[in-house]
Amino acid sequence: KIEDLQKLLTWVEINYGFSLDNVLQELELELFTKKDTFYLIPVKYLDQFNGFPFSMLGMKLGKYSGDNFMLSHEFISRFGSKFENGIMTIDDEYLDHWMQGRDIRSLSDKTWQMGTIVVVKDSRSRILGGGKILSDRIRNLLPQRYVR
């Protein structure tokens, strides 16, 4: 639905200070939905192979989980350094803990609304993935395939 797509573009702009619309235009991508999941697919592919079935194509933007939209790890990794909002920097003492896929339980920053999905980076501004703000911790959203 066009109104849902526009709503998503606006949501990304408001929450992360990032123009997804500009990326779509500059990289010649189109938003494509499959169930509750959104993908960024090259326009050239759609122009030439629009009727072909697919199981995996393009970059996963994210998906709805209930009423919340969760950006994919791949999208955060690729574009998170360009975000202006929704970024949380973790102290170096938690870096190994985070990369092992564990949550950070000593959350001292209470400025985030519970349930917010943030881009997590380290003190050197390296993007580490996504995290979900909970009442007592930051839930690590790092996919298991990246846990070391």
Each language-model region and where it sits:
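Polybasic, low-complexity RNA-engagement segments
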Residues: K1-R148
